Regions:
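Beta-strand-dominated extracellular/periplasmic modules and repeats
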Residues: 1-86
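Extracellular beta-sheet/turn segments enriched in Thr/Pro/Gly and aliphatic residues
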Residues: 86-107
Length: 107
């Protein structure tokens, strides 16, 4: 079985109020191959909690020899990121910071 990685985050406006709406993770690759078995990539979509937080399971982008990424769409903006496997999980802020250093509203 292909491992999954949990991605968590919290989105808030500059005023500190939580962002409301949906978060969508769209993989650039529909399938990955591991040990000669083809697996569908997870493409989760979830509603932000009242405090602007979310948690989803995704297919890590480093489990296949072909390079691919996720597009993460939120009411606060969108990002294209790699999601390496990490049993402890990943944060949206960490994924965004890895590709776009600097201050961001996501946590």
């Amino acid at each position: 079985m292909i491992p999954t990685t949990t991605v968590t985050g919290r989105l808030q406006h500059r005023s500190g109020l939580p962002v409301q709406g949906m978060v969508r993770f769209t993989p650039s690759r529909l399938w990955v191959v591991r040990d000669n078995i083809t697996w569908a990539c997870l493409a989760p979509e979830t509603r932000l909690a009242a405090d602007g937080s979310f948690s989803v399971q995704v297919t890590p982008t480093d489990t296949d020899p072909i390079w691919w990424r996720y597009m993460i769409e939120t009411p606060a903006g969108w990002w294209e990121v790699s999601v390496p496997h990490n049993a402890a999980g990943q944060t949206l802020r960490g994924l965004i910071g890895e590709h776009h250093p600097g201050s961001r509203a996501a946590q």
